[in-house]
Curated annotation (Swiss-Prot):
<dbReference type="GO" id="GO:0051539">
    <property type="term" value="F:4 iron, 4 sulfur cluster binding"/>
</dbReference>
<keyword id="KW-0479">Metal-binding</keyword>
<feature type="binding site">
    <location>
        <begin position="266"/>
        <end position="268"/>
    </location>
    <ligand>
        <name>GTP</name>
    </ligand>
</feature>
<keyword id="KW-0004">4Fe-4S</keyword>
<dbReference type="GO" id="GO:0061798">
    <property type="term" value="F:GTP 3',8'-cyclase activity"/>
</dbReference>
<dbReference type="InterPro" id="IPR013785">
    <property type="entry name" value="Aldolase_TIM"/>
</dbReference>
<feature type="binding site">
    <location>
        <position position="264"/>
    </location>
    <ligand>
        <name>[4Fe-4S] cluster 2</name>
    </ligand>
</feature>
<feature type="binding site">
    <location>
        <position position="261"/>
    </location>
    <ligand>
        <name>[4Fe-4S] cluster 2</name>
    </ligand>
</feature>
<feature type="binding site">
    <location>
        <position position="71"/>
    </location>
    <ligand>
        <name>GTP</name>
    </ligand>
</feature>
<keyword id="KW-0411">Iron-sulfur</keyword>
<protein>
    <recommendedName>
        <fullName>GTP 3',8-cyclase</fullName>
        <ecNumber>4.1.99.22</ecNumber>
    </recommendedName>
</protein>
<feature type="binding site">
    <location>
        <position position="24"/>
    </location>
    <ligand>
        <name>[4Fe-4S] cluster 1</name>
    </ligand>
</feature>
<comment type="function">
    <text>Catalyzes the cyclization of GTP to (8S)-3',8-cyclo-7,8-dihydroguanosine 5'-triphosphate.</text>
</comment>
<dbReference type="GO" id="GO:0046872">
    <property type="term" value="F:metal ion binding"/>
</dbReference>
<comment type="similarity">
    <text>Belongs to the radical SAM superfamily. MoaA family.</text>
</comment>
<feature type="binding site">
    <location>
        <position position="31"/>
    </location>
    <ligand>
        <name>[4Fe-4S] cluster 1</name>
    </ligand>
</feature>
<keyword id="KW-0547">Nucleotide-binding</keyword>
Length: 340
């Protein structure tokens, strides 16, 4: 283990998010709108994706640099064939203490048991409404919320620790906050509401569509008796609250109204093998895939990863204003390449 590395703003590296595919079986407007990601959209060919062997090699070196947590993302990660094999290999890396996955949940019954047997224990399921019609309008694939709720119940039944992520958009699904808090409170499943972010280039974001953390909290407090919960660790992105009657928790992620750049410890590996220091990056990522395919040693890879982190100075959300979003000259990476 080398000495702990820090970026230009003094932030250590502790988390690595690995996007295993740019494909998804949903077409949510805030991520992959169907008007752009239509039937003729060309996704990455297989040889442009990192292999599992390459992902494991990169993760091993990152573990030597201080990474403790891995998160598998997409696109929709369950579309990557034989994903359980990757989980099993990542689970053997010294120093990795936690592996999670973010998914839309549609294929959990198909793949969940193999993933659990491979060592995956934590899943975040993206579910933006509990009402079938609202959810179908969001995913644009006629998938009912009840279908995903059934998949969540299955995942819990075989032992997974499940959290639910909800991106809230004003006038689209903000009426889902109270019924979803109520539903998952009774299930004692943690739900996290996320402020609508300007990820990618095609989701039509502006401030008028954001429901802030304080607005969400006011809604929830008017219906439930709750109290705040202290953060569990440095860099925790959600502000947590618990119900006083049964202790069930929910979180609010202030990605717009109160940024958490100063405690961000995440490196991101895109589905095409590039390093990014921020979800909102407008700078082309360093191509780790090409670098390792050129025949470099692990020592050379380690030095490159150290350099990439040492020069990191991303703080996009700290600097975001409506004007900077409108005047942005360079495109950001789309979320299907980098995960949420």
């Amino acid at each position: 283990m080398v000495a702990q590395i820090k970026d230009k703003l003094g932030r250590p590296i502790r988390d690595l998010r690995i996007s295993v595919t740019d494909r998804c079986n949903f077409r949510c407007d805030y991520c992959m709108p169907k008007e752009i990601f239509g039937d003729d959209y060309v996704f990455l060919p297989k040889d442009e994706l990192l292999t599992f062997e390459e992902m494991v090699r990169i993760a091993k070196v990152y573990a030597e640099l201080g990474v403790k947590k891995l998160r598998i993302t997409g696109g929709e990660p369950l579309l990557r064939r034989n994903l359980y094999q990757l989980i099993a290999e990542l689970n053997q890396i010294d120093g990795i203490e936690d592996i999670g996955m973010t998914t839309n949940g549609l294929l959990l019954k198909k793949h969940g048991q193999k993933l659990y047997d491979a060592g995956l224990r934590r899943i975040n399921v993206s579910l933006d409404a509990i009402d079938n019609e609202v959810f179908q309008a969001i995913n644009n694939r006629n998938i009912k919320a009840t279908t995903i709720l059934d998949q969540i119940d299955y995942a819990v039944s075989i032992g997974f620790h499940v959290k639910v992520n909800v991106v809230i958009q004003k006038g689209i699904n903000d009426d889902q906050i109270i019924p979803m808090v109520d539903y998952f409170k009774d299930k004692n499943i943690e739900i996290r509401f996320i402020e609508f972010m300007d990820v990618g280039n095609d989701n039509g974001w502006d401030f008028s569509k954001v429901v802030t953390k304080n607005e969400m909290l006011d809604m929830i407090e008017s219906h439930f008796d709750i109290e705040p919960v202290p953060p569990k660790y440095f860099g925790e992105v959600a502000k947590y609250y618990k119900h006083k009657d049964n202790g069930a928790q929910f979180g609010l992620i202030t990605s717009v109204s109160a940024s958490f750049c100063s405690t961000c410890t995440r490196a991101r590996l895109s589905s095409d093998g590039k390093f990014y220091g921020c979800l909102f990056s407008t700078v082309e990522g360093f191509n780790i895939k090409s670098f390792i395919r050129s025949g470099v040693t692990d020592d050379e890879l380690r030095e490159q990863l150290i350099t990439l982190w040492n020069v990191r100075d991303d703080r996009y959300s700290d600097e975001r204003t409506e004007q900077t979003v409108k005047n942005r000259q360079r495109k950001k990476i789309n979320m299907n390449y980098i995960g949420g």
